[in-house]
């Protein structure tokens, strides 16, 4: 709704002032048949006639009141007739309102005629102070000028103003639009001021562009939101442009008659041919569109409605309503706006449900689940249209009606389909009849003869007028239609179908995607085999008209306009392929030279994938076939590239390179025997700069490579052409691989192999159970030491390894047969050898023979490593080993992904999933302080944060080298904003906690391979003491955390000093800890009387707090200092200076507290010795891997023996009721002894400090006599005076010697 303010000045000068913020005062009519401008022109014209008549009457000096009354009544009658004839208001009250306004305008014109002529035309009208806004309760209000409570006030001043509100959008005269010029690659904001027609707007845009860059006669304005062109001769205000609305300025392929005449002339005079091209769906790493489950709308990403805000910020649920400046008239906005509003309301009601929804992956324009029948997805026409049209075109970050007011959902992917990559294109699919046929609309980026005229623009096109029927691009494809159908039947297209599609189509997004995950692309249509049938029904084949002299590069550039939001270096990996598997690579050849005929069908498909391979501190940029498996790629790297890389490390010369193009022909492959020997370039580098190998046809590298190879069902023929081209770094485009570069075994080699096996058959036992073992033993004798691996070692046990593959053990150096896990295992090969044919067949299956000089690299494979912010303090870094059975496209890698080619048998790695995730997403999770481990995880993109936590916890629990003492429920994932660059929506200098109940889509700042920190989620345990709120302890004078002081005070209130076994008891419950944490966070620990909080729980809480410190207090002392501090009290006091603050203050506070507890040892049975034994394990970290070098030197049997003993020892410790420590040292015997020795020293150190504090308090006389801390419960006092020396405490007769000194019972003082 828009408010229009009129006064006498604006009417006389034809200046209408629009203000959307004014209150809506007077509602005259609901619908106006004529346009707004014509309406006001009519009002102005009629009022001008009335004013002329009144002026004539005034000049005649006719002051007769009766005459004036008659003329006034006559003017009212004329106005009444005018309104009745032109507007025909349905209600009498509206007629009276119009008459009232007209009469006041006439009266104001009569009384102020002389003053109005001298007034300024640009004065701004002021609002009457007595006006009040209209009540919103009643739908319609009547007005009368009798009091100040009405919304209209009559005045005789020049600035009198009247508010008229219409149910129609009125566009401003001044509007700023964002104009995109795709041909120039320019986006500018242009102010359109007093522009009357579209032609004037075009001339204004031409003035703002660089001079001479575009021709105004060939360009027009295009509205991507409505997918329509503007009429050149139409008024500019007709299209109701909004502020900062985005429009496109490009060549008009169907705008006017002149354009169509020129196009028809070109078609009649210049040779052309039409090519049908299948356009794939390209998905870019980012966010995924909304999902539909059983016809319902799932959780959708809620985006900010403001275009000025960041396109990456995801906001919470917002209202679906529009502001005061939006219009609702169907004639102005079309039916698409009303459809989108209804669908948006449906989504808002659906998003109110907070229950988690399992999100499924979309494979086409509608969501597909193999477990759900297809009919359930499209049972609702409104919902199916919404999902099928809008969700397939998601990719821009600007909001749309279907994404406002919804919850974030579960996928961090950005779907840039072919439908929305170009805003001028529109593709929609709607089920017809039984759902087998799908209509797809055409794109406006193709030729003008192909695209049908837009709806609501002109009913008849020029081609229909002159009798030429345009070829449409909408094909009716049945469900049984295969890709690239051989049929070239005519395409069915009609304006009615297009009009119906345009009415159902949702508004496209306005701006290009700018999410930080925009790294690369992959073809979604090649991921899962069970989705191929659904994808075949959604084929997008469009017709393009090209001139005969058009080159392949021009053809690809025209196709790439559909994917204009993807970087061009990514689109360079795409090319055309025919139905017969013919790739077109030479972009300088014309379509005539390439053999493309009229009405041919080709496919626009990805041909190569750029990968950075890191080997021996060198980077090379290679291009691989996305359909190749990792096993094939690993073999190609070893055979074709490792020789050059090894030579690079030995050569200092930089040679010139030559590149070659590939022309892959299926038909000529059977008869072609071409050979080539271009020179291969080698390039040395002492740094980590990427090396680009642009030529593969080297006689030295590809000497064993056949000319004819196979890619799937297509054969490949390599035709080398010399081209002198300079290539450098990532701008180079290395040659792509074929699927199989293997050489068949020649007849001579096959004969030698058969003769060799026949000679050895006589030495093989006839027992099939021992055949594999004998073959393995014989082959192991012939192999070199460097060729022995785990497969050969495992074959030493003949009776236990009958299932091993014999072909893997036939490593004969004379015949150059390398082991391979790709051979076929069968009964004939695992059992008796059988005939020679079986042997020959098994050997031929080994398609990846490695030369002798490269056998040492047979275990080298590709790994995915963390490349961002490497932490040198990580002890165990697990890279992800890429599964060799998966294809490169299944990993969803972006261009220039960095993969490390290294040994997979010795390095730490975690295997990738055998079954490829439907939406893979890669994260690096690191835990520094607690476990010092880092993992690269390949996760399903639909997982919650809690699922990612479970996956990482499973890796930690399965790692035998990691000792976990704490429950993993206390840990969570954090995103560190300090080391992750400048990204929008981040508060730097802190870590963002990832909510376990949310998905990755809630955190759009997380990019693939970002590092997440695995650390504690609470603010009490495991926190650095420097970051905790502290205050001065009045007793000790140290700066102590407030929570420790509150816990001690609560302990005193609960009379914890008199409870027996107060620090020895560990039978606390999780409920107690939960209640204590809750009261500490709320600050009610000292004031509440919670029955679940007792003194034993407080004591256990203090022990847990000291055990969870990031740095254990006694671990800060080196071994020599700790040994020195454990000897006597004076050395213990002197060693305190070696402990840094604030840990020294914490230790002294704890010693003071324990000394106070030990003073009541008669009642609580906790002497200084017992307290030292109980608390010491919490002050020192005991690692089970103190002697890893000794463990590695032990053989397997010896290691297993000690491993069994350690488990038996752990069971004994758990069953011992006298042990009260919190750590169990389990390792080899040497490591166990070292850990217990340090624990013993820590116990003596703590006991000496407690004794020293007791001496300071006056409980012990300062003399040469010593103290013996008794463990007997029958003694009347915990202090016994003896005349022996201080060293008598370690004698064998001492009651504590069996518990503290080194003896076989040292484990009695150790407890978890």
From Swiss-Prot:
Compositionally biased tracts (Polar residues): 147-158, 437-449, 508-518, 763-776
CDD domains with a match to the protein in the record: RhoGAP
Major localisation: cytoplasm
PROSITE patterns in UniProt: RHOGAP
Keyword Cytoplasm: yes
Cellular location(s): Cytoplasm
Chain spans, region Disordered: 52-74, 111-158, 314-519, 762-831, 1185-1230, 1282-1312
Residue ranges with Basic residues bias: 1196-1210
Recorded GO CC terms: cytoplasm; plasma membrane
Residues covered by the Rho-GAP domain: 1030-1212
Highest taxon of the lineage: Eukaryota
Biased composition (Low complexity): 53-67, 111-146, 328-355, 373-397, 414-436, 479-507, 792-816, 1213-1222, 1282-1305
GO molecular function, one term: GTPase activator activity
InterPro entries according to UniProt: FERM_f0, RHG17/44/SH3BP1-like, Rho_GTPase_activation_prot, RhoGAP_dom
GO terms, biological process: chemotaxis to folate; negative regulation of small GTPase mediated signal transduction; positive regulation of macropinocytosis; regulation of actin cytoskeleton organization; regulation of Rac protein signal transduction; response to differentiation-inducing factor 1; signal transduction
Site positions for Arginine finger: 1064
Keywords, alphabetical: Cytoplasm, GTPase activation
Known role: Rho GTPase-activating protein involved in the signal transduction pathway.
Protein name: Rho GTPase-activating protein gacG
Organism (species): Dictyostelium discoideum (Social amoeba)
């Amino acid at each position: 709704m828009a408010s229009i303010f009129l006064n006498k000045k604006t009417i006389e000068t034809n200046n209408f002032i629009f203000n959307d913020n004014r209150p809506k005062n007077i509602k005259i009519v609901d619908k106006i048949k004529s346009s707004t401008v014509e309406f006001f022109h009519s009002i102005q014209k009629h009022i001008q006639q009335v004013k002329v008549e009144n002026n004539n009457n005034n000049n005649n000096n006719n002051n007769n009141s009766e005459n004036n009354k008659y003329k006034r009544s006559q003017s009212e009658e004329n106005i009444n007739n005018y309104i009745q004839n032109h507007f025909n208001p349905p209600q009498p009250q509206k007629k009276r309102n119009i008459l009232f306004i007209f009469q006041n305008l006439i009266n104001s014109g009569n009384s102020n005629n002389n003053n109005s002529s001298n007034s300024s035309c640009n004065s701004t009208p002021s609002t009457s102070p007595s006006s009040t806004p209209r009540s919103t309760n009643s739908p319609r209000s009547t007005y009368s000028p009798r009091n100040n409570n009405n919304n209209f006030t009559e005045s005789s001043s020049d600035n009198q103003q009247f508010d008229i509100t219409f149910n129609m959008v009125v566009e401003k005269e001044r509007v700023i639009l964002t104009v995109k010029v795709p041909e120039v690659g320019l986006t500018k904001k242009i102010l359109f001021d007093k522009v009357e027609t579209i032609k004037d707007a075009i001339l204004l845009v031409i003035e703002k562009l660089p001079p001479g860059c575009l021709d105004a006669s060939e360009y027009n304005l295009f509205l991507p939101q409505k997918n329509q062109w503007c009429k050149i001769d139409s008024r500019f205000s007709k299209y109701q442009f909004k502020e900062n609305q985005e429009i496109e300025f490009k060549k008009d392929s169907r705008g006017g008659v002149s354009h169509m005449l020129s196009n028809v002339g070109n078609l009649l005079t210049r040779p052309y041919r039409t090519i049908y091209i299948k356009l794939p769906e390209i998905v870019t790493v980012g966010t995924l569109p909304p999902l539909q489950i059983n016809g319902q709308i799932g959780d959708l990403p809620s985006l900010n409605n403001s275009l000025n805000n960041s396109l990456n910020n995801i906001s919470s649920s917002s209202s679906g309503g529009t502001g005061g400046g939006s219009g609702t008239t169907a004639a102005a906005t079309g039916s698409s706006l009303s459809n989108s509003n209804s669908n948006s309301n449906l989504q808002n009601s659906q998003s109110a449900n907070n229950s988690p929804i399992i999100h499924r992956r979309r494979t086409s324009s509608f969501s597909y689940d193999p477990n759900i029948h297809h009919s359930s997805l499209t049972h609702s026409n409104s919902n199916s249209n919404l999902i099928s049209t809008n969700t397939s075109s998601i990719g821009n970050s600007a909001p749309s009606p279907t994404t406002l007011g919804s919850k974030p959902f579960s996928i961090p992917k950005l779907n840039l389909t072919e439908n929305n990559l170009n805003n001028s294109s529109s593709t929609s699919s709607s089920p017809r009849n039984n759902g087998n046929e799908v209509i797809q609309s055409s794109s406006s980026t193709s030729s003008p003869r192909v695209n049908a005229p837009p709806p609501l623009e002109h009913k008849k096109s020029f081609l229909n007028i002159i009798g030429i029927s345009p070829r449409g691009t909408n094909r009716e494809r049945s469900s049984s239609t295969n890709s690239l159908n051989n049929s070239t039947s005519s395409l069915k297209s009609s304006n009615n179908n297009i009009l119906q599609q345009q009415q159902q189509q949702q508004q496209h997004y306005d701006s290009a995607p700018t999410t930080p995950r925009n790294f690369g692309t992959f073809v979604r249509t090649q991921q899962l085999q069970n989705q191929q049938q659904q994808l075949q029904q959604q084929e997008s084949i469009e017709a393009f008209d090209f001139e005969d002299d058009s080159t392949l590069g021009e053809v690809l550039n025209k196709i790439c306009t559909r994917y204009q939001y993807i970087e061009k270096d990514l689109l360079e990996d795409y090319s055309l392929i025919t139905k017969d598997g013919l790739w077109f690579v030479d972009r300088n050849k014309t379509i005539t030279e390439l053999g493309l005929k009229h009405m041919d069908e080709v496919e626009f498909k990805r041909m190569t994938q750029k990968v950075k391979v890191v080997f021996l501190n060198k980077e090379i940029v290679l291009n691989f076939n996305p359909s190749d498996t990792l096993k094939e790629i690993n073999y190609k790297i070893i055979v074709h590239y490792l020789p050059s890389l090894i030579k690079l490390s030995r050569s200092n010369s930089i040679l010139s390179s030559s590149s070659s193009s590939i022309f892959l022909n299926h038909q000529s492959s059977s008869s072609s025997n071409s050979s080539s020997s271009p020179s291969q370039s080698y390039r040395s580098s002492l740094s980590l700069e990427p090396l680009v190998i642009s030529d593969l046809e080297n006689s030295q590298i590809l000497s064993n490579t056949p000319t004819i190879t196979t890619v799937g069902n297509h054969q490949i023929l390599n035709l080398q052409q010399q081209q002198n081209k300079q290539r450098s770094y990532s701008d180079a485009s290395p040659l792509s691989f074929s699927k199989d570069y293997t050489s068949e075994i020649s007849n001579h080699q096959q004969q030698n192999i058969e003769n060799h096996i026949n000679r050895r058959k006589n030495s093989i036992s006839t027992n099939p159970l021992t055949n594999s073992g004998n073959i393995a033993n014989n082959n192991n004798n012939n192999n070199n030491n460097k060729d022995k691996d785990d497969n050969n070692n495992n074959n030493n046990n003949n009776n236990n390894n009958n299932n091993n593959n014999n072909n893997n053990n036939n490593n004969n150096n004379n015949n150059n047969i390398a082991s391979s896990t790709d051979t076929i295992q069968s009964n004939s090969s695992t059992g008796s050898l059988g005939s020679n044919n079986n042997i020959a067949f098994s050997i031929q299956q080994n398609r990846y023979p490695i030369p002798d000089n490269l056998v040492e690299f047979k275990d080298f494979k590709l790994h995915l490593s963390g490349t961002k912010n490497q932490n040198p303090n990580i002890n165990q870094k697990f890279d992800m080993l890429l599964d060799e059975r998966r294809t490169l496209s299944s990993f969803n890698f972006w261009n220039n992904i960095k993969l490390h080619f290294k040994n997979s048998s010795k390095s730490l790695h975690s295997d990738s999933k055998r079954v490829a995730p439907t939406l893979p997403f890669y994260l690096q999770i690191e835990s520094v302080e607690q476990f010092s481990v880092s993992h690269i995880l390949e996760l399903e993109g639909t997982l919650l944060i809690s699922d990612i936590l479970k996956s990482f916890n499973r890796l930690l629990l399965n790692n035998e080298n990691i000792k976990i003492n704490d429950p993993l429920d206390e840990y969570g994932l954090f995103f560190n904003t300090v080391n992750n660059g400048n990204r929008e929506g981040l508060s730097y200098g802190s870590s963002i906690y990832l909510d376990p109940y949310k998905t990755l889509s809630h955190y759009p700042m997380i990019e693939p391979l970002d590092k997440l920190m695995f650390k504690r989620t609470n603010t009490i345990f495991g926190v650095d003491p420097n970051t905790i709120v502290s205050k001065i302890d009045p007793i000790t004078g140290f700066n102590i955390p407030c929570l420790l002081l509150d816990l001690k005070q609560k302990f005193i209130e609960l009379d914890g000093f008199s409870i027996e076994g107060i620090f020895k008891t560990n039978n606390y419950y999780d409920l107690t800890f939960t209640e204590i944490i809750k009261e500490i966070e709320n600050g009610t620990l000292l004031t509440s009387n919670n029955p679940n909080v007792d003194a034993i729980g407080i004591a256990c809480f203090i022990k847990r707090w000291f055990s969870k410190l990031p740095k254990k207090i006694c671990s800060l002392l080196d071994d020599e200092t700790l040994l020195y501090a454990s000897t006597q009290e004076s050395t213990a006091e002197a060693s305190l200076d070696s402990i840094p603050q604030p840990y020294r203050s914490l230790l002294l506070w704890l010693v003071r507290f324990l000394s106070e507890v030990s003073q009541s040892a008669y009642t609580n049975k906790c002497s200084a010795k017992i307290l030292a034994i109980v608390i010491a394990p919490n002050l020192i970290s005991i690692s089970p891997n103190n002697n890893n070098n000794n463990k590695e030197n032990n053989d397997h049997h010896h290691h297993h023996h000690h491993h069994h003993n350690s488990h038996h020892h752990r069971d004994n410790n758990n069953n011992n009721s006298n042990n009260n420590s919190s750590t169990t040292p389990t390792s080899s015997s040497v490591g166990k002894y070292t850990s217990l020795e340090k624990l013993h020293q820590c116990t003596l150190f703590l006991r000496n400090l407690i004794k020293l504090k007791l001496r300071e308090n006056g409980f012990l006389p300062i003399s040469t006599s010593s103290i013996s801390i008794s463990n007997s419960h029958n003694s009347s006092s915990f202090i016994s005076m003896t005349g022996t020396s201080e060293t008598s405490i370690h004698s064998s007769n001492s009651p504590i010697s069996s518990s503290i000194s080194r003896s076989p019972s040292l484990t009695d003082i150790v407890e978890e």
